Amino acid sequence: MSQNIRICRWAKLFSGKNGYFAVFHSLNLEVVFLEQKFREMIELLFLGTTLDFLTRKFEKLAEIAEVIAELSRCGLVVPVENDDLTLLDEKRKIHVLPPGLETLYLIVADDCNLACDYCFILNNMPENYRSRRMSFTTAKVAIDMYFRNLVRNPLGYEKLRKTIYFYGGEPLLNFRLIKQVVEYLEHQYKDQISEMGEKFRMSIVTNGTLISKEIAQFVAARGNFDIAISLDGQEESHNKKRPFINGKGSFEKAIRGLEILKQEGKKEISLSCTIADHNIDELPSLLDLHRKYGFASINLNPLVDTAKDPVSKKYMWKVSKRMIEYFTLAREEGVYEDRMMRKTKSFVEKKIHAYDCQALGAQLVCSPDGQLGVCHEGTGIKQFFFATVDKDFDFHKNTVIAEWKQRTPLNMPQCYDCPALGICGGGCAYGSWLRNGSIWSVDDRFCVHSRTTLEWLVWDLFSRL
Ligand code: SF4
Ligand code: SF4
């Protein structure tokens, strides 16, 4: 007697390319491409059927047993009585782990010498906010607290990458502090840093305009100090959105900073590009900059919601499309954009990407006045900030951090039937809170990007078979 079988809950269909459609498993991340002639068979499998029945009904389709065997191997076809939620539980056990500290953001200055109107830090500041600079006393306590917590990481302190970000506003407005902190780290935590080797990084994202010879030498002398410069493309588009406070464009000064870094021997410099209407149709021009300056990586940042300016779905559709076009072009030159790459890696390696942001249980942010929180976007209004910096603060026992760590599509019933469940990571929790008042709501702005990327990945794979 033939077994009753059906399509499992996690199977998602992508229709129509060159006479084929795709059946994709949103948790195993397996994909099977089938000719359209099997479409009716799949429809019957959604209802539940038997192999005997299918063989009789589609007697002209000689490969039917083979196709069912392949669908079963990938978990796409299961016995009718299968409990599909068991697989979700298994995946959760592997991928939803307790919080584990990896990243510390020190907001060393929350003001800036530029006036970019899309800045998510400045646009989330309360009215009449007075900007601040971090003191060495605050930074030192934060560093001591960070190192005490690193060794407590239940996920294995040695294996994970650990990064201290010097962040702003414009962090180089407080370079004096950065220098003091780095020297303190190199003196006080010399052994730990040497033991961590490549796993320990310091990092800065800067607008580049304040880079002097002294700063460049300081950065270039350290192999574990990463630097990214914000450039939105060629001069005209960059200057439209990234002017100095006096209105003058900042491109020339940013490029000057980049060149000083190069002259002083800094080899690995990254480019960080924010995508808005000024450059959305010109992303390939970033590759011209890459050919000239040889960036270590190019990261594209879609706008995030701010208290003043929510991002529209129309914008996200366009960004998603342009990012895919850019990714396709850039990979021909061996350049892999990070945000797209995280999903691509998950898809190719068939490994669930449960979180797309370190704020979800792996990151701590210290504001200039020494308040601790999970996400730098909340720095101004101190949203999701919960303690004053103290060397005894226990990251791994904090309830806000524990809740954020749980926020993954694997724990969000709204996501269970989404094709992108396994590769998405859930987008931005802070944006979800801003839009809907809860980190547990779906970041629907980001959904557009995840789903569009998944569909592209499926058909990109097909085109390479
Ligand atoms: S929660 Fe959102 S704004 Fe905060 S760090 Fe994550 S992606 Fe960025
Ligand atoms: S956040 Fe959106 S795209 Fe991601 S899994 Fe949930 S519903 Fe799908």
Segments predicted by a language model, with ranges:
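Long, charge-rich, low-complexity alpha-helical segments
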Residues: V32-Y105, K140
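Radical SAM/AdoMet-radical enzyme domain recognition
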Residues: A139, I143-Y167, N174-P302
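Local cysteine-cluster metal-coordination motifs and their immediate loop/turn environment
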Residues: D111-L122, V374-E377, M412-Y430
